[in-house]
Amino acid sequence: MENNNEDKGAIRMIVPIPCADKFFRLWLEVLKPQHQLTDRETDLLAAFVAKRHELQRTNLSQDMIDAILMSSQSKKEIRKSVKISTAYFQRIMAKFRKRDILIPDSNIKGGKINPRYIPVLKDDDKNIGILFMFIDPNGT
């Protein structure tokens, strides 16, 4: 763990967390106050975000990535990987739309994942880095 005190009393720390396949699930746990999904729903969203990240490693446009992610073939693969029934999958997808986790896009049937739930990653094939800034609401 690296701790670097810089100007104005800011504390910066690097904390390595081995998480491999659980990264996107952990990311969504941090965002739980925003989405308030159940564990099973969070697992499904994490599978979508992980698949999207995998697709981002290609040279495809963002629109193409979103279209592939929301294709019936990708949805079926993701549903099977999370081991949920088709009916339950459809209920969760409806809930995602209702809560703006999936947002409308005229080019993509069923919408696309709200960028709020997609982490902006610095990806070097071995490590994924995310910067969290916890801001004091009182400004102190």
Model-found features: residue ranges?
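Minor-groove-contacting beta-hairpin "wing" of winged helix-turn-helix DNA-binding domains
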Residues: I108-V120
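Short glycine/proline-centered loop/turn elements that form peptide/ligand docking sites
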Residues: S71-Q73, Y88-R91, G111-N114
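A short, conserved structural fragment
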Residues: I84, F89-Q90, A94-K109
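Eukaryotic partner-binding/assembly regions in large regulatory complexes
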Residues: M1-G9, I103, Y117-D123
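Short helix->loop/beta-hairpin flanking segments within DNA-binding domains
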Residues: L37-Q73
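Short, amphipathic alpha-helical interaction segments positioned at domain boundaries
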Residues: Y117-T140
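Short helix-coil junctions and helix-kink-helix linkers
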Residues: I65-A87
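Positively charged, structured surface patches that bind polyanionic biopolymers
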Residues: M1-Q36
